[in-house]
Amino acid sequence: MELGGPGAPRLLPPLLLLLGTGLLRASSHVETRAHAEERLLKKLFSGYNKWSRPVANISDVVLVRFGLSIAQLIDVDEKNQMMTTNVWVKQEWHDYKLRWDPADYENVTSIRIPSELIWRPDIVLYNNADGDFAVTHLTKAHLFHDGRVQWTPPAIYKSSCSIDVTFFPFDQQNCTMKFGSWTYDKAKIDLVNMHSRVDQLDFWESGEWVIVDAVGTYNTRKYECCAEIYPDITYAFVIRRLPLFYTINLIIPCLLISCLTVLVFYLPSECGEKITLCISVLLSLTVFLLLITEIIPSTSLVIPLIGEYLLFTMIFVTLSIVITVFVLNVHHRSPRTHTMPTWVRRVFLDIVPRLLLMKRPSVVKDNCRRLIESMHKMASAPRFWPEPEGEPPATSGTQSLHPPSPSFCVPLDVPAEPGPSCKSPSDQLPPQQPLEAEKASPHPSPGPCRPPHGTQAPGLAKARSLSVQHMSSPGEAVEGGVRCRSRSIQYCVPRDDAAPEADGQAAGALASRNTHSAELPPPDQPSPCKCTCKKEPSSVSPSATVKTRSTKAPPPHLPLSPALTRAVEGVQYIADHLKAEDTDFSVKEDWKYVAMVIDRIFLWMFIIVCLLGTVGLFLPPWLAGMI
């Protein structure tokens, strides 16, 4: 049917009426739903008093179900002993005055209302340390048609917490949060634990602490102020510190600094930096101890384990300073200031080094000792240097006896290969070879000790003692016909120095020394003396190297002039001085070795202490299950 037909004007009014009626009904239904909550609020709060407990009878008890949900563990202040947490306080109770029938209000079963308009239990945090005891942000409450009220306001609490820093930084703390009504006793308001544990579904993990456990318990207590019994719900938080930060920044540096204390006793005493290192370690440990005192509570009844470790190490560092001063004193001792007791020599030079597996290096003083012994033998041997019984007869100026040097002149047989030779008392120098061959005369003569042919000398052989340079070369002539290269003590041995003592021959021998005779001696006379420079070995006495041509009578000794006597006294003085220096050096080395042994003893002691201290630092927390 078309609307433009003849019946169209008749159908249009009924359609418009039907459409208007539907729109009116829909608008009235929306208006009814919106006004239902308004009417409900007017009905609920008309004559409602939020100051009275929501009970029908005065003897009834309001049961409040209480729960806690933690959102974040903000901080644990060890210094002020506070725990800061962000929690949601769950509370639920029934208010009989806030009931309605949903059928009367367009099936409205629940509404959100401002919490300021209704009665709320005055539940506060008992062990609040700072801030507000009660909830400050009053959020809306969820009201159900049966009179049940749910209120979950957020809150940031700073609760007091007794911090136990015994195993710091491997510590585990037990902090509590105690909630309860401030004014209503158990006869008015009773608490019911909503959950046995704290809700951690929305917990944001902390970078320093981890919650091991959080359990809520219901308690009742009668306080001294009042006769009533007050209930409370206490949540015990078991939190454990994450020790990585403190291990990297506190424990490892402390251990390394403590190990430096061990190196103090390994540092040689000659360097002079032992005291400086000790004081530097002591100051470093003091700085770390100050860092710990800033972290731990100042009123703590216990000392943290790392504090005990640092304090123990500081005591040992202080002792190391005292010991180092003593060791340096021992190290620089000398025979002129201290005498080494026998027990010190026995204990620290014999017994303790063997126990510590120490082997003392040998002191290279053999050459010096041989040198001193040689000088003593040269200066004090009676067979070479007896006191002269009288002055020698006067001689001519050209043939006068020159005062010999501290060389030993004794008659020797003419060797197969005559010539001066030098032997060194030192093991480090090779034996010297003869520098020049000499021809031995086949006819003995009582003539004087002469140089080789072609060489004229003004007197006897002169050999320098304590020479430090080569005295001659193979082609060089020396005084008295003696050539030798010497680096140390030498003595000159005339080969044929005297004739057998016969009647009238002694005077002839002395007279023959005053002439420049170049004639060959008769066959029945001793040959002219030939001098050989020899070095005296340390282990062989000079008398052992002397070979006499005749064993029937001892050779006569040469008289000593005053100059030669002074030279002998000088050699004796030098030998005594060197011997005293050698003795002083040996005693000083003994004192230095005693200081080294004492250092080694305390080195091992401190190594053991550091190991035991490290084990003592980590073992108790490990046994307690905190590591």
From Swiss-Prot:
Q: Where is the lipid attached (S-palmitoyl cysteine)?
A: C271
Q: Which gene encodes it?
A: CHRNA4
* Known role: Component of neuronal acetylcholine receptors (nAChRs) that function as pentameric, ligand-gated cation channels with high calcium permeability among other activities. nAChRs are excitatory neurotrasnmitter receptors formed by a collection of nAChR subunits known to mediate synaptic transmission in the nervous system and the neuromuscular junction. Each nAchR subunit confers differential attributes to channel properties, including activation, deactivation and desensitization kinetics, pH sensitivity, cation permeability, and binding to allosteric modulators.
Q: Which residues form a coiled coil?
A: none
Locations listed in the record: Synaptic cell membrane; Cell membrane
The residue spans the entry assigns to the Cytoplasmic side of the membrane are as follows 331-600
State the protein's name: Neuronal acetylcholine receptor subunit alpha-4
Q: Which cysteines are joined by disulfide bonds?
A: C161-C175, C225-C226
Glycosylated position list: N57, N107, N174
Effect listed in the UniProt record for changing D75A: Loss of CHRNA4:CHRNB2 channel opening potentiation by divalent cations
Q: Which residues form the signal peptide?
A: 1-26
Extracellular face of the membrane: 27-249
The reaction(s) catalysed by this protein are:
Ca(2+)(in) = Ca(2+)(out); K(+)(in) = K(+)(out); Na(+)(in) = Na(+)(out)
Q: Does the keyword Repressor apply?
A: no
Q: Which residues carry this modification: Phosphoserine?
A: S424, S538, S541
Q: Which UniProt keywords apply?
A: Cell membrane, Disease variant, Disulfide bond, Epilepsy, Glycoprotein, Ion channel, Ion transport, Ligand-gated ion channel, Lipoprotein, Membrane, Palmitate, Phosphoprotein, Receptor, Signal, Synapse, Transmembrane, Transmembrane helix, Transport
Summarize the activity regulation: Activated by a myriad of ligands such as acetylcholine, cytisine, nicotine, choline and epibatidine. Channel potentiation by calcium is stoichiometry-selective, CHRNA4:CHRNB2 nACh receptor is achieved by calcium association with topographically distinct sites framed by anionic residues within the CHRNA4 subunit and between the CHRNA4 and CHRNB2 subunits. nAChR activity is inhibited by the antagonist alpha-conotoxins BuIA, PnIA, GID and MII, small disulfide-constrained peptides from cone snails.
In terms of SUPFAM superfamilies, this protein maps to: Neurotransmitter-gated ion-channel transmembrane pore, Nicotinic receptor ligand binding domain-like
**Which segments show compositional bias classed as Polar residues?**
538-548
Q: Which domain of life is it from?
A: Eukaryota
